[in-house]
Amino acid sequence: HALGEANLAMDSLAEGVQRYSRFWYQLDQLYRKFTYHVRMSGQASLMGSLTEQIENLYSNNYLLKLGDRFQTFVDAASKWEAFPVRKQKEFFEHWVRPFLRKDNKVCVIISDAMRYEIGDELLRLNHSQNVPNDNEKVRQQLVVELDPVLSMLPSYTQLGMAALLPNKE
């Protein structure tokens, strides 16, 4: 089972962010889908033993261990960076401003505490669809990207959302 066998080793904060955004997020995705399907089955009581086992693995073998490993690097950091991962405060200039300079349209989905794995699911849904233009002769090409960013610290809604907007320090 993936939760018990995941190698959660990392040698730096940057490596941890990269490994999460390439591999580990899938564990969160599988867990979310499992809990969703258990609820939707209407048979939650029949799944009780399995649900308890998965909840314990997810909480103790994954979330706790991963959180402890990340915390080690957070505690040791003298400067809050994880190059090449961009900082949250660089979001607008790096991802939005280039579209605006070219007078292109851009849509940004900002959701408080949207998990990376849900962003991945949205990315996959968008890649699987073509959106027809009004005249049906031209198809609009959606460009959808998902990149991790390093959150502001302390991490709370008002500070995080403000960091995404163009402003001076």
Segments from the language model and where they lie:
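…; additionally, a secondary subgroup of soluble metalloenzymes is captured
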Residues: 1-106, 113-169
